[in-house]
């Protein structure tokens, strides 16, 4: 049986996973660094890289034990090799290449974004093509997923990623880290129409997005308030999340139009939302409603596979393994790596 070992270390989670040729996740271990970074209110790259260095061996041993797998039974090793915080990417990639060399098994370099892009094929076995909204702390883009290694970016943020905006606003409100889940929790108790925030370039007519102005507007409001109690925090969180929903819903319409100009007579009309922001239940509901208006089904992975994980890396590796797309061991990890350049 084919078994792919996946390794993910592009940001602050050390993750290792093993999946089979039948898309079965035998084990999916994630060692979080949230506690280490919380005191700084964000991820510190050097701390993240050092933690990956000490965590990877532990994670690998846990995965092998949990899956009852021997290293010699691994068919190939897939590892995130960009984009991301380059220190962590190098640590994970070197670890994977060392295993590949020692075991004499193929090494497969995976683009982290491709891992997110293909997650729905792991969980729901959806066919190509489909429209993807990749929304995370580092990226926000609409992508036409036409086939393996056939990706066309329809639009992306011109400044901040949507996940970054969530984290920064959470920090302004003195909420915990990571901020996305904190904003979502507080928004449930707030009035989403209490504050009106700008929706930058919402009428641009293309699929590009902007969140920097929205973030600045929230900061300006907070600085102008004499008192910030729980009610105010909840209202700001709800109004901010509502505005994000409005922006993404509007841009989804633009993306659908651009996608349909590219794809003719597609039987399966699927839209996938992936990345950490895809775990937000409010945004899932808003975007699902918008997708249905155009006859599309919105698909999102289970919450534990929305955020960074190694199962998605292993699956992307499986697709490449099945097509004999292996990577030389002298591959150079990349801090930046466009999906269209794979």
Curated annotation (Swiss-Prot):
Cofactor requirements of the protein: Fe(2+)
PROSITE patterns, per database record: GLYCOPROTEASE
Cofactor binding description: Binds 1 Fe(2+) ion per subunit.
Compartment(s) of residence: Cytoplasm
Signal sequence region: none
Keyword Translocase: no
SUPFAM superfamilies recorded: Actin-like ATPase domain
Source organism, top-level taxon: Bacteria
GO molecular function list: iron ion binding; N(6)-L-threonylcarbamoyladenine synthase activity
Residue numbers binding Fe cation: 112, 116, 308
Keyword Plastid: no
Binding locations of substrate: 134-138, 167, 180, 280
Keyword field: Acyltransferase, Cytoplasm, Iron, Metal-binding, Transferase, tRNA processing
UniProt GO BP: tRNA threonylcarbamoyladenosine modification
Disulfides per UniProt: none
Gene Ontology, cellular component aspect: cytoplasm
EC number assigned by the record: 2.3.1.234
Catalytic activity from the UniProt record: L-threonylcarbamoyladenylate + adenosine(37) in tRNA = N(6)-L-threonylcarbamoyladenosine(37) in tRNA + AMP + H(+)
Stored InterPro entries: ATPase_NBD, Gcp-like_dom, KAE1/TsaD, Peptidase_M22_CS, TsaD
NCBIfam families, A to Z: gcp_kae1, T6A_TsaD_YgjD
Role, per record: Required for the formation of a threonylcarbamoyl group on adenosine at position 37 (t(6)A37) in tRNAs that read codons beginning with adenine. Is involved in the transfer of the threonylcarbamoyl moiety of threonylcarbamoyl-AMP (TC-AMP) to the N6 group of A37, together with TsaE and TsaB. TsaD likely plays a direct catalytic role in this reaction.
Protein family per UniProt: Belongs to the KAE1 / TsaD family.
The protein's name in its UniProt record: tRNA N6-adenosine threonylcarbamoyltransferase
UniProt organism field: Rickettsia canadensis (strain McKiel)
Gene for this chain: tsaD
């Amino acid at each position: 049986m084919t078994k792919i070992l996946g390794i993910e270390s592009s940001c602050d989670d050390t993750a290792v996973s093993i999946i089979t040729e039948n898309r079965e996740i035998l084990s999916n271990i994630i060692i979080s660094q949230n506690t280490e970074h919380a005191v700084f209110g964000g991820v510190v790259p050097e701390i993240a890289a050092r933690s990956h260095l000490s965590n990877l061996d532990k994670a690998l041993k846990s995965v092998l034990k949990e899956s009852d797998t021997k290293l010699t039974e691994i068919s190939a090793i897939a590892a995130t090799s960009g984009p991301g915080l380059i220190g962590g990417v190098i640590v994970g990639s070197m670890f994977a290449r060392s295993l590949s060399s020692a075991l004499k098994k193929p090494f497969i370099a995976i683009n982290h974004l491709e891992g997110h892009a293909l997650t729905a094929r792991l969980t729901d076995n959806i066919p190509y093509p489909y429209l993807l909204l990749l929304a995370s702390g580092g990226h926000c883009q609409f992508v036409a997923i036409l086939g393996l290694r056939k990706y066309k970016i329809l639009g992306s943020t011109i400044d901040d990623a949507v996940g970054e905006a969530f984290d920064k606003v959470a920090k302004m409100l003195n909420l915990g880290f990571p901020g996305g889940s904190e904003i979502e929790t507080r928004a449930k108790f707030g009035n989403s129409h209490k504050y009106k925030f700008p929706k930058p370039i919402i009428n641009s007519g293309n699929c590009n997005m902007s969140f920097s102005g929205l973030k600045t507007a929230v900061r300006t409001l907070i600085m102008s308030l004499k008192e910030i109690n729980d009610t105010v925090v909840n209202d700001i969180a709800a109004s901010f999340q509502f505005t994000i929903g409005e922006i993404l819903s509007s841009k989804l319409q633009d993306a659908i139009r651009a996608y349909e100009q590219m794809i003719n007579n597609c039987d399966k009309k699927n839209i996938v939302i992936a990345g950490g922001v895809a775990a937000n239940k409010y945004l899932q509901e808003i975007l699902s409603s918008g997708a249905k208006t155009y006859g599309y089904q919105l698909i999102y992975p289970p919450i534990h596979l929305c955020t960074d994980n190694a199962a998605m890396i292993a699956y992307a590796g499986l697709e490449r393994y099945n097509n004999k797309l292996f990577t030389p061991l002298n591959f150079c990890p990349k801090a930046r790596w466009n999906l269209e350049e794979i």
